Amino acid sequence: MNPEHSPLGKATVYANQYDASLLFPIPRAGAREQIGIGAPLPFFGTDIWNAYELSWLNARGKPQIAIATFYVPAESPNIVESKSFKLYLGSFAQTAFESADAVRDALKRDVSAACGASVTVRLATPAEFRKLQMDELDGLSLDRLDLDAHVYETDPSFLTASHDEAPVEETLVTDLLKSNCPVTGQPDWGSVQIHYVGAPIDHAGLLRYIISFRNHTGFHEQCVERIFVDILRACQPVKLAVYARYTRRGGLDINPFRTNYNQPMPDNARTARQ
């Protein structure tokens, strides 16, 4: 489905009765083709969605709440457009379910169907809220650099590596990622962590490259995949992982992770801005 046909940017009727048809899938293939990604994919990973505004009724009509987390595999053929996701979650509000497990089962069934792959769903009940973590992304901050930046359209020419030097293993972070919704033009604010093994990557160039997304339009997942592919092509690291945490909009935050080597899934700790 084309993003222009999604609920984004259109007058909205908010349903309060459960309706799985509200989910609007968008194929990943189109955006991947634009940056030269085909089969097999040069990465694997997950999109972590956190939904903070989930509520339903129990069998006696009493409202229940939970925080839902969705783990969408990067190899799924589709993503779900975020406003349609919000409307879908809102449709639970006046619908009675026998249990939280029944809600989780419905979420897993519907979102898996929309994405075209098995999606893992976890619900955190109010009794578990105190266990939820908040932390910043680990790594050496690129934002410490005092530099000029004047390019705000994606420019991978900033990316360079010193292949005549000994390989290094580094984790770099920045809070200066900004991109824009391709349908509404609304800004998307994020932090990104880049871990790699290979020739040393020029830090100033990498930061200027991330800043160059400032006027770029793309969904969160697409931006992270572009970052991954541009670094892989320009700097040729042996190992590479890119993880972004975007600030919340409409009760949802989206946190894509891409890697080309086996490693544990990153934790789902919220950053301060989230």
Swiss-Prot record:
It catalyses: 7-aminomethyl-7-carbaguanine + 2 NADP(+) = 7-cyano-7-deazaguanine + 2 NADPH + 3 H(+). It is an enzyme of class 1 (oxidoreductase). Keywords: Cytoplasm, NADP, Oxidoreductase, Queuosine biosynthesis. Pathway: tRNA modification; tRNA-queuosine biosynthesis. Its main location: cytoplasm. One of its GO terms (molecular function) is preQ1 synthase activity. Substrate binds at residues 80-82, 220-221. Belongs to the GTP cyclohydrolase I family. QueF type 2 subfamily. Homodimer. This is NADPH-dependent 7-cyano-7-deazaguanine reductase. It comes from Burkholderia mallei (strain ATCC 23344). The gene is queF.
